[in-house]
UniProtKB/Swiss-Prot annotation:
Residues at which Mg(2+) 2 binds: E299, N301
Similarity remark: Belongs to the CarB family.
Keywords: Amino-acid biosynthesis, Arginine biosynthesis, ATP-binding, Ligase, Magnesium, Manganese, Metal-binding, Nucleotide-binding, Pyrimidine biosynthesis, Repeat
Single annotated GO MF: carbamoyl-phosphate synthase (ammonia) activity
Region ranges (Oligomerization domain): 403-582
Organism annotation: Leptospira interrogans serogroup Icterohaemorrhagiae serovar Lai (strain 56601)
The name this protein goes by in its record: Carbamoyl phosphate synthase large chain
Gene symbol of the encoding locus: carB
Binding site for Mg(2+) 3: Q857, E869
Quaternary structure and interacting proteins, as annotated: Composed of two chains; the small (or glutamine) chain promotes the hydrolysis of glutamine to ammonia, which is used by the large (or ammonia) chain to synthesize carbamoyl phosphate. Tetramer of heterodimers (alpha,beta)4.
Length: 1106
């Protein structure tokens, strides 16, 4: 069937900022879709609010809108661009919900625009729980017994009928947001209320529990000619009850019989036909009763999903690309397979290897939060690995997580083992049992501990419900450990075949010596240096032994067809097997190290940089070799680089690939902290590091050496000291004076960073600091209160420097730069200060002999400039600055690393802008109830958005809409501000009153407003216990905006319940005076002149006036 000629232009809806449940897999799918449509001559218009994406680069789409993802914005784009169709199926739940909202608002009909990829009826049928249930009953597919509730009363009736426990699933939400399991009468009301609030249509499905059943997913595609293909089957190791995004998953499925699998296939085909998805892909989830084989369908996503990205990377079948082509009328048999170049897309992929995906969590960023896993997703990232067997891919996936685990235990991580041995037999059993019963992020390692303690497969299965087949595989690894302890290096090849890393082999070799060294001491960190040195030495010996025995990995190709046809795309994984398929070329090549799994502090921004570096190398005619382990990303798409290795980013794995490929050098400065940690060891092995040298990086990141740099350049930094003991820390803090900022050296995302106000807090911090700091000293700085923080990105070729962006933070110093909104160009810095910042940046970059990118964080207080931190690498602000400046900064940095000078690059004389840009962050507090939303020096945000406008006020307001705040245009504002900021906020609060908002305030703020002629109603403080309080009003939806700026720890604790209620009831809550001022300024501007939208292409063509 030929392409539809009536579709000449398409608006692609992106997924917005990275949030838990919706990450960079949609940058991958959106980028694929845009490329595919453009290749077919279709004009592509793109809407996405996330600047850290490849898809929003202005050279991908014809018109790129970095604007709020709202119905009014879509309407303005439709008026202006007049597309023929909208593609909403590659932008996750955000895009689907926006498309449905546009349909409900009547604008699709008004502008005669068609939804492609999935029709409105099909989306509703799959997403609306009641319609889906009826559709399944029609075709005889069983769904869990359930009932729909739109209020608490209905929910109670359903509960009385079905009994407890019940699964609560809100309609039209992402990553299970708002979902939960109601086990008891006491928790039932709370879980249901939360679900109703989370659903955009205030609807929840209450479902009979199938906890403990096995969970499977099938990726399915269908075209207009009713061809249906099953791309991939995926099995969850964790049983039902854990969100699939939080579960370890395996492809293809491992434990179904052929008959059972064929049954799921048949059901999937029937389901996609009944729902009516006829031009794209869907993900269908099943539960299978492990005792009798009963099958229940759980849900269907009528779009490209997180699992689609995993399935694409697992099979090499580009689901999003093919879904985009199906949406414009092609059929599967008309689309060629890129990898084989001969088979059509209607050939189902066949794979002769096993893929394992493991989620990565960030509970350490949210102290006090419950780490129990359930139906609401909590993982912030994931790693994927490929092996010839499950054992091999499972161990590789665990070491890909980058959490200091090098496989399935036996890797030098002792905390669980030592704690277990400090208990008596009864206590130990109770402790292990509880961790196996309760799903949690470390449960797989408690399975290992249980085996070590003598548990049988049946005992472990009864506690955690993981299928026995997987437990047998894990038990097999333990048996091999014991065999290695007896036979040593004579079975090295056998050990490497099942994924054992050199670190694990080193540990097994030295286990007795290490345990004797620890002698039962739970403070492993006290002996960490000694242990690490022992393991490292032993690892090197094992490496020599492997080399002498010629036990080396081979590299196999992902070919979609289990070797039946030749594969043309160089997409590899390692294995200890016979035939090597890497076919290394003689072309000039450079290796790029990716960032590994997403985590807070290291996310999509670094993947963006890696992709841009690859494109730059290709432009220069240099073969790009990418190593990464993240299945969500554009960097692990087989056509982003010339050669892709899907491998863990450990020294062992990276060096083996380097030995195989023999590139001219390795680029480490784009993948965040992951590659930087490898720099010194790679250099010691003779690997050429391109760009800034590891020694220069060390001069910037090692505090002692960095202080020497600052003294040489006569630059200010906050008074500071370096402590290696509790006593030293106390002395330094006392000398500097509280408050102080403490942090370990070599961290990203403010890990373990804290503002300390008194000695008791310092003592508590130091109890944990040694373990966190990785044997690096503790840094203690004077905390600059009320300072303005500034972020600077610059390019340097070793001789000259170009400052690409000076960003002024909207929040005050003390909030991690990754959690602070910032504005470009700055709005309040004097010309003298801007000149001083430029001069300091130039001097630092040249002193450190930077070749490529550098990021510097400054603080300005009383017109004095202080250096906070220097990072001679790409920073998370680089994509934002690139979009604002209109220049591909990373490509320029790559060209510098390859020997070009700044003068040869097409840069302006200095940074210049036509619009004001604001970067705002997105925080995941809705996933972590009970955590205080007050920000500090440890980063917690998962994503970012970018507001662009002619004024800072409008740009900031846009950024708030993009970040998910439902900002009111009328209603009631609750104001509770500290004495320090009352005077500066007075005129802004007055503006709110003049905009027509009603004001309510606590006693002190109410009196201040009244004394200054501003009308407000007084409301009781929460801890007064007198009705009504602000909390009561929030619960009753009587408050629409909160301005709450606590000053001391006491007032923060007092207003904690208010901030928690704001999250639960989705009320925008501002906790800093600067954010309040910026928002109110934007609201005034919006009322006076409305808002405008421009594509990036238009913005970059405008006169540069700022």
């Amino acid at each position: 069937m030929p392409r539809r000629e009536d579709i000449r232009s398409v608006l692609i809806l992106g997924s917005g900022p990275i949030v838990i449940g919706q990450a960079c897999e949609f940058d991958y799918s959106g980028t694929q879709a845009a490329k595919a449509l453009k290749e077919k001559g279709i004009r592509v218009i793109l809407l996405n609010s996330n600047p850290a994406t490849i898809m929003t680069d202005p050279d991908l789409a014809d018109a790129t809108y970095v604007e709020p993802m709202t119905v009014p914005v879509v309407q303005k784009i439709l008026e202006k661009e007049k597309p023929d169709a909208i593609l909403p199926t590659v932008g996750g739940q955000t895009a689907l919900n926006l498309a449905l909202a546009c349909n409900s608002a009547g604008i699709l009909e008004k502008y005669n625009v068609e939804l492609i990829g999935a029709k409105v009826d099909a989306i509703k049928k799959a997403e609306d729980r009641e319609l889906f249930k009826k559709a399944m009953e029609k075709i005889g597919v069983r769904v869990p017994a359930s009932g729909l509730a739109n209020n608490l009363k209905d929910a109670v009736e359903i509960k009385n009928k079905l009994g407890l426990p019940l699964i609560v699933r809100p309609a039209f939400t992402l990553g299970g947001t708002g979902g939960g399991i109601a086990y008891t009468e006491e928790t039932f009301e709370e879980v249901v209320s939360k679900g109703l609030k989370a659903s955009p249509i205030s609807q929840v499905l209450l479902e009979e529990s199938v906890l403990g059943w096995k969970e499977f997913e099938l990726e399915v595609m269908r075209d207009l000619a009713d061809n249906v293909v099953i791309i991939c089957s995926i099995e969850n190791i964790d049983p039902m009850g854990v969100h699939t995004g939080d579960s370890i998953t395996v492809a293809p499925q491992q434990t179904l019989s052929d008959k059972e699998y064929q049954n799921l296939r048949d059901m999937s085909i029937a389901i996609i036909r009944e729902i009516g998805v006829e031009t794209g892909g869907s993900n269908i989830q099943f539960a299978v009763n492990p005792t009798n084989g009963d099958v229940i369908v759980i849900e269907m996503n009528p779009r490209v999903s997180r699992s689609s990205a995993l399935a694409s990377k697992a099979t090499g079948f580009p689901i999003a690309k093919i879904a985009a082509l199906l949406s414009i009328g092609y059929t599967l048999d008309e689309i060629k397979n890129d990898i084989t170049r001969v088979t059509p897309a209607s050939f189902e992929p066949s794979i002769d290897y096993v893929v394992t995906k493991v989620p990565r969590f960030a509970f350490e960023k949210f102290p006090g939060t419950d780490d129990t896993l359930g139906v609401q997703m909590k993982a912030v990232g994931e790693a994927m690995a490929i092996g010839r067997t499950f054992k091999e891919s499972f161990q590789k996936a665990l070491r890909s997580l980058e959490i200091d685990r090098y496989g399935f235990g036996s890797d030098g991580y002792f905390q669980e083992l030592l704690y277990s041995r400090s208990l008596n037999n009864d206590q130990r059993k109770e402790w292990i049992d509880s961790h196996l019963k309760r799903p949690n992020d470390k449960r797989i390692f408690y399975v290992k501990l249980a085996f070590d303690e003598g548990y049988t497969v049946d005992q472990i299965h009864d506690l955690c419900k993981i299928d026995r087949w997987f437990l047998w595989q894990m038990e097999g690894l333990l048996k091999l450990e014991k065999e290695y302890s007896e036979k040593g290096n004579s079975i090295l090849y056998k050990m490497k075949q099942v994924g054992f890393s050199n670190r694990q082999l080193s540990f097994l070799k030295n286990k007795k010596q290490i345990l004797d060294l620890l002698d039962g001491n739970l403070r492993v960190d006290l002996k960490k240096t000694e242990i690490q040195n022992l393991l490292k030495l032993s690892e090197e010996e094992i490496e020599v032994e492997l080399g002498s025995k010629k036990i080396l990995p081979v590299y196999k190709r992902i070919d979609t067809c289990a070797g039946e046809f030749e594969a043309y795309t160089p997409y590899f994984y390692s294995s200890y097997d016979e035939e090597d398929e890497s076919d290394v070329t003689n072309a000039k090549s450079v290796m790029i190290l990716g960032g590994g799994p997403n985590r807070i502090g290291q996310g999509i921004e670094f993947d963006y940089c890696c992709c841009q570096a690859s494109y730059a190398l290709q432009d220069l005619g240099i073969e790009s070799i990418m190593i990464n382990s993240n299945p969500e990303t554009v960097s692990t798409d087989y056509d982003t680089s010339d050669r892709l290795y899907f491998e863990p980013l450990t020294l062992e794995d990276v060096y083996r690939i380097y030995q195989n490929e023999k590139p001219e050098g390795v680029i480490i400065q784009f993948g965040g902290q992951t590659p930087l940690k490898l720099a010194k060891d790679l250099e010691k092995k003779g690997v050429k590091i391109l760009g800034t040298s590891p020694d220069s990086i060390d001069r910037a990141e090692d505090r002692k050496r960095f202080v020497e740099v600052l003294e040489k350049l006569k630059l200010n930094s906050p008074e500071s000291g370096i402590a290696t003991s509790m006593e030293e820390a106390r002395e330094i803090a006392h000398k500097i004076g509280y408050p102080v900022l403490v942090r370990p050296s070599y961290v990203l995302g403010g890990r373990a960073m804290l503002i300390i106000n008194e000695e008791k807090e310092l003592d508590r911090y130091m109890e944990k600091a040694e373990e966190i700091s990785k044997d690096r000293p503790l840094l203690i700085d004077s905390f600059l209160e009320d300072a303005i923080e500034v972020d600077v990105d610059a390019l340097c070729d070793g001789k000259e420097v170009f400052v690409t962006g000076i960003m002024e933070h909207i929040e005050e110093a003390g909030i991690h730069s990754g959690d602070s909104a910032c504005v470009l160009p700055p709005q309040t810095l004097s010309k003298n200060m801007m000149d001083e910042i430029r001069k300091a940046t130039v001097n630092l970059a040249l002193e450190l002999q930077v070749k490529g990118l550098i990021n510097i964080q400054y603080a300005v207080k009383n017109e004095i400039l202080y250096i906070i931190e220097v990072n001679p690498r790409a920073s998370r602000t680089v994509p934002f600055v690139s979009k604002a400046l209109g220049h591909p900064i990373v490509k320029y940095a790559t060209r510098i690393m390859m020997g070009e000078s700044l003068k040869s690059l097409p840069l302006p004389k200095e940074m210049e802008f036509s619009q004001v840009s604001v970067k705002e962050v997105v925080l995941p507090f809705n996933k972590f109830p009970g955590v205080d939303t007050i920000l500090g020096p440890e980063m917690r945000s998962t994503g970012e958005v970018m507001g662009i406008a002619s004024t800072a006020g409008e740009a900031f307001l846009k950024s708030q809409y993009m970040a998910g705040d439902e900002l009111p245009s009328q209603g009631t504002v609750f104001v509770s501000i500290n004495d320090k900021t009352k005077a500066e906020l007075l005129s802004y609060i007055k503006d709110l009153s003049e905009l027509g908002f009603n004001l309510i305030a606590t006693s002190g703020t109410h009196k201040f407003l009244s004394d200054n002629g501003i009308l407000s109603s007084k409301i009781n403080k929460v801890y007064d216990g007198i009705f009504p309080t602000a909390l009561d009003y929030i619960r009753e939806n009587k408050i629409h905006l909160i301005i709450n700026t606590p000053l001391s720890r006491v007032t923060r604790d007092d207003s904690f319940t208010i901030r928690q209620a704001a999250i639960r009831f989705k009320v925008p809550c501002l906790t800093t005076s600067n954010a309040a001022k910026a928002l109110i300024k934007g609201m005034v501007e919006m009322k006076n002149k409305g808002f405008t939208i421009h594509s990036l292409q238009e913005i970059h063509a405008m006169p540069k006036i700022l």
